[in-house]
Amino acid sequence: YLRGFEIAVREGHARSIMTSYNPLNGYWTASNYDLVTTILRGQWGYTGLVMSDWWAEGNDRGGAGSTKHVAAMVRAQNDVFMVVADPEHNSGGDDLATALAEGRLTRGELQRSAANICRFLLQTPAFRRGIGRTSALDDQLEAMAEQDMQQAAQSGQPLTLRDGTAIDITAI
């Protein structure tokens, strides 16, 4: 069953993956260490972001599934739990703080997921533009836009936006 997913991840150069709602071999996929860490990250070499489906359940050691079992998801390297209405006040009542205090989750496991999230963000075009690094496509599109602006200014015609607003760019 996994071959199609492996092809999509490797050949499609996936940068983010959402785990499904369902259990597989007794473990909900959002918290399935073998699936997310051993296979996806280990065997396939995936380094991107993994997020749960909205209000996905997780379980620990084959127990009952619950949206509160977020520590098991973090341990499996499911980096982002979707969705929490008020994370500052733990409105979902997840078990992260308790699991950390009891030693069922380590600071290193939390840091590993934080590193996965940061690695993902550092590779986004928005981040690259924010630090002044653009791709060849960004540079090409910017040059084309500049050329279009110059041609419009030389023609003496106003630039018309999608909403119909006309802008006189001859003085630009």
Kindly label every feature range from the protein language model.
Residues 26-34, 64:
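Short glycine/threonine-rich loop-to-helix capping motif typified by GTGT followed
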Residues 2-13, 36-43, 119:
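Structured alpha-helical segments in the cores of large, soluble enzyme domains
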Residues 13-15, 44-48, 78:
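Short, well-ordered coil/turn segments that N-cap beta-strands
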Residues 4-28:
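Short acidic, glycine-rich surface-loop motifs adjacent to enzyme active sites
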